[in-house]
Amino acid sequence: MSQNRKDDHIKYALEQRPGYNSFDEMELVHRSLPKYDLAEIDLSTHFAGRDWEFPFYINAMTGGSQKGSQINEKLAQVAESCGLLFVTGSYSAALKNPSDTSYQVATGRPNLLLATNIGLDKPYQAAQQAVADLQPLFLQIHVNLMQELLMPEGEREFRSWRQHLTDYSQRLDLPLILKEVGFGMDRSTVEEARSLGIQTFDISGRGGTSFAYIENQRGGNRDYLNDWGQSTLQSLLALQPMRDEVELLASGGVRHPLDMIKALVLGAKAVGLSRAMLDLVKNYSVEEVIDIVEGWKSDLRLIMCALSCRNLQELKNVPYLLYGRLKEAQEQIK
């Protein structure tokens, strides 16, 4: 992927105006008599083979350009200081250009919790190289079919994707996460990928950055596809029957701690933030972003206390109300 395309993605992601967000159509039921003290609230979670202190992380965004390198450097500083997981953008650019150091953010940061990302169009050998280069805690594998179809330079051959997923699962010795890129993930996809050996899924729904919008801004002429896909909460609702069978992660349109809590109520093990973090490092100093993220941790505890939930397991039993398009979609889920 060219540096220009990487920078285009950053540019148009920041320019995109927010549209429909399904998080606004879910309401949590307040509890007036609390069970716990604020100090008792436990934010820890578990997915991809290990425990995590907090149920949110910095999701895959960028790399492969000077601008991407600067953003990754800031995000890595925030992640290490706050004890957050940081997932780099797709490592494909570094595979094409071995001199690219925009992903080498762990250098000099022994406490950084780092994972990386690669597209499912890449064969096992490419994934193996990414793992060897970065030694990530897990490998996030993105599926971006609509984005590829809308890119003039995008992939046009997809039959190999299932075989690649099988190869990754059978031959890579680290946890794998299958990730959408803002179009949502349906139950049949999760069931099939699970049969191929995948246990953890970032369902990344519509509501945040739209790569359909971005590719159309880059010169496409299919604006009518800008809102393609299902929202994050639509995807989580559709996957309720599987939430105890697989590990679900949620991203796409997550703006603040209340959105995070709503996703956790619907069974997500953790919540990924991309656009929200991109906005922060663009508009604030690293020190200010660290303060904001630390505030998010406090806010998560505050909201959980208001819901009389001591931990994430108890959050799954919180009653909620749905409205509008989200309620209509939920009623049609089979």
Curated annotation (Swiss-Prot):
Primary role: Involved in the biosynthesis of isoprenoids. Catalyzes the 1,3-allylic rearrangement of the homoallylic substrate isopentenyl (IPP) to its allylic isomer, dimethylallyl diphosphate (DMAPP).
Residues involved in FMN binding: A60, M61, T62, S90, N117, K179, S204, T209, G253, V254, R255, S274, R275
Molecular function as annotated in GO: FMN binding; isopentenyl-diphosphate delta-isomerase activity; magnesium ion binding; NADPH binding; oxidoreductase activity
Domain of life: Bacteria
One GO cellular component, as annotated: cytoplasm
Binding positions for substrate per the UniProt entry: R5, K6, Q147
Family according to the record: Belongs to the IPP isomerase type 2 family.
Subunit and partners: Homooctamer. Dimer of tetramers.
Top-rank EC class of the record's enzyme: isomerase
The gene coding this protein: fni
InterPro entries, alphabetized: Aldolase_TIM, FMN-dep_DH, IPdP_isomerase
Main location as per UniProt: cytoplasm
UniProt KW keywords: Cytoplasm, Flavoprotein, FMN, Isomerase, Isoprene biosynthesis, Magnesium, Metal-binding, NADP
Name this protein carries in UniProt: Isopentenyl-diphosphate delta-isomerase
EC number assigned by the record: 5.3.3.2
